[in-house]
Amino acid sequence: MSKRILVVEDQADNRRIIRDMLARTDYEITEAENGEGALAAIAKQRPDLILMDIQLPIMDGYTAVSRIKADPGLLSIPIIAVTSYALNGEEKKARAAGCDDYVPKPFSPRQLLAKIRQYMVR
């Protein structure tokens, strides 16, 4: 059975780029455009890992991560923040919200895959 990744990203082009980067893997990809969509997707099918953009419409990534991590049944899902806001303190804010890791945009396929594999082997 392949492992599932939920990609939460409001920009369709960025979702496509990530999907293309993961196309040669065995991961099953699900997508959401915002935090509310992420919560709905998780309720339908629990992912093994979440790639979460932080700057999202409707419900931002910080709020979505906090809600996910507040649920004891979802606490073990690794969440990697993926954001173009690579400012000082952004990684700290992401981790404080409950993200397990952080990848600043732009990133290479190699960098993203290495980060994903780090959590998928657990």
Outline where the language-model segments fall.
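Conserved acidic carboxylate
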Residues: 9
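Charged docking surfaces used in two-component/phosphorelay signaling
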Residues: 16-24
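Acidic, metal-coordinating helix/loop segments flanking the phosphotransfer/catalytic sites
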Residues: 31-49, 66, 92
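Hydrophobic residue at a beta-alpha junction
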Residues: 32-33, 56-59, 68, 77, ...
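The feature encodes the CheY-like receiver
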Residues: 45, 57, 75, 87, ...
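C-terminal output helix
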Residues: 107-116
